[in-house]
């Protein structure tokens, strides 16, 4: 059974978790090691149009932010955005079995690369199962309020899985 103490995380889930929870402490409570590829670190610092989540990301000193760019395989580089490609490449390089990616194509390629995949909703559900005090409905609403895109299928699944169906 692969260890679920280590995870490599992409940009979108980092931003989604800050939107849902207000910080990244949930990751610290679930994982011994949370690695952030250099490429993801750069994407976060650029901050999109709003700069959302930069302060929370920088204050999470326990995150293992990689200090140098990766050499990414041409297959990953040509198939995915830089963040997703770097998450999968770092996982393969460091023999870490679990990655956190929200985008469908990145998730598919991670699985084809032999990796276990979770996403921002998967992390929230695991936290709830392990006793972290949170409402999945509230977390999802906060994500939607910050323009995090979630399909109705994912929302319905998460609420049902969390036992929060009405």
Enumerate the language-model features and the residues they cover.
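Active-site-proximal, substrate-binding regions of enzyme catalytic domains
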Residues: 2-97, 104-107, 111-115, 138, ...
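Hydrophobic alpha-helical interaction segments
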Residues: 119-163
């Amino acid at each position: 059974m692969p260890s679920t103490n280590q995870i490599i995380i992409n940009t979108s889930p980092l931003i989604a978790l800050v939107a849902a929870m207000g910080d990244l402490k949930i990751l610290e409570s679930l994982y011994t090691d949370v690695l952030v590829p250099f490429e993801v670190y750069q994407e976060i610092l650029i901050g999109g149009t709003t700069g959302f989540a930069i302060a929370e990301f920088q204050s999470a000193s326990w995150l293992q932010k990689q200090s140098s760019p990766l050499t990414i395989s041409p297959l990953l580089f040509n198939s995915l955005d830089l963040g997703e490609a770097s998450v999968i490449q770092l996982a393969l390089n460091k023999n870490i079995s679990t990655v956190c990616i929200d985008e469908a194509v990145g998730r598919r390629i991670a699985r084809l690369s032999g990796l276990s995949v979770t996403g921002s909703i998967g992390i929230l559900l695991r936290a709830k199962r392990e006793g972290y005090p949170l409402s999945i409905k509230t977390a999802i609403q906060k994500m939607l309020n910050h323009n995090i895109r979630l399909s109705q299928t994912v929302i319905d699944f998460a609420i049902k899985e969390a036992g929060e169906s009405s």
